[in-house]
């Protein structure tokens, strides 16, 4: 129906609703690239609507156009700020402001742009101060947990250890748990194995307090943190010398990642295959590492199209 409208009615290409709907229709399809033109048009069609400026990036991220993902979401955020000055910060549109900055983090990380990712993460935190989180904690709190993923993506191990656990661990229950995960991974990579094991224990205690009601869009925080646990245990075991055990945990993390409910951006910000591929290379398992990276890049079509990350620098570097 939508494609018929675009084929038969030239005015459809200036209809924001049709363009918006088509992008959402195609983002889970085998051919998201069909909506690239629609996104390009929508980006400039209503320049004062931040969400519509952002919308094309739902397709860009699936097609490996990560520079557009970053630049368009930063532009959308600029528009959002203008609306915030007009309408204030305490309204439903706060979620859209968070979403655009959250998306910008993904674009920056896939590009390998550390400074841009850290900047977007810092700005995202500014959008979710305590008073905002308290309005809808089951939705808003998980945005605060974005920063540790950026630190891990860029191997900022010393900086991770210096991160403070939240004072209000009930309000920031997901963030508290994820920070223990990050610190365990950091210590494992720094060779501080005893500290890593202690953080694993702290993670388990914190994880037990996470309620089923806490979500990151379509996925429960508990499911996302269950994936984090496998990643954490995999890194800790591997760096301790238990390579087989570690790799098996990471393979389980990949399985859990593949079975999370679809959303954009993805609930787990750093593709699990990147860590698995890197440690497989370190272990000399070159054939499996190649297969892991090829799957992540979508070169072998083994993964559903929305689960592929074409042209990302991390998997390309590993494959090279």
Annotate the PLM regions:
Residues 6-11, 40-48, 78-79, 86-91, ...:
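Solenoid-like repeat scaffolds
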Residues 10-17, 31, 48-51, 89-92, ...:
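Structural signature of alpha-solenoid helical repeat junctions
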Residues 21, 55, 62, 103, ...:
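"A position-specific structural signal for the A-helix of alpha-solenoid helical repeats
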Residues 25-26, 60, 108, 151, ...:
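Residue at a conserved register position within TPR or TPR-like alpha-solenoid repeats
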Residues 31-32, 66, 114, 157, ...:
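TPR-repeat structural position
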